[in-house]
Amino acid sequence: KVAERFSSFVNPLKPIPLFIEQLTGISNEMVKDAAPFEEIAEKVSALLSDAYFVAHNVHFDLSFIQEELERSGMQRFTGPVLDTVELSRIVFPGADSYKLSELCEELNIRHDNPHRADSDAEVTGELFIHILKKLAWLPPATLQALKRLSRSFISDIEDVLEDIISERLLNLSEPEHIEVFRSIAIKKHSKQAHNH
């Protein structure tokens, strides 16, 4: 669930290029009275403290935040990151595309203002909730395998997977349709499948 929301226009202290205005719908007029990043840097830093930074293509978004925090005299974010592009590739391997707008369409997530930071953040949060739900349904053996592989991921997902595994192990048996063979969870063959 979403615990808190924060959204603010930021005055970039320079003109917004026309192509950015066309992409985002944010004009120079809309930000002329907004605070520069320095004035909200402390709030942003506080929100990031002891938190995961979740984004769709996390290093792209984080690079802007890092640059602005540093320019404002604040410490760079050093916490864990979760990349919903990477995680979507894992839990939705059959998706036609991993663009945020197309994943939203496929998962029936309403995305009214693509390329606007607040709208993108909102739907990325919803996408992440879908990812967590999908992970929660995976068999413990699959989660354990993912956890072992996660050391090579962009996403710092190991602790998240550990929490899901711990919760799943409270339900000690695998679902009826799953069998584990050499630590790999696979769907059992149904008798009907063998007869066709």
Label every PLM stretch briefly.
Residues 92, 107, 131-135:
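Conserved NTP-handling cores and scaffolds of large molecular machines
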Residues 75-88:
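Conserved beta-strand -> loop -> alpha-helix junction used to position metal-binding or nucleic-acid-contacting
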Residues 116-131:
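Acidic, divalent-metal-coordinating active-site segment for phosphoryl/phosphodiester hydrolysis
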Residues 65, 87, 124-128:
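Buried hydrophobic packing segments
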Residues 129-196:
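Acidic two-metal-ion nuclease catalytic site recognized across multiple nuclease folds
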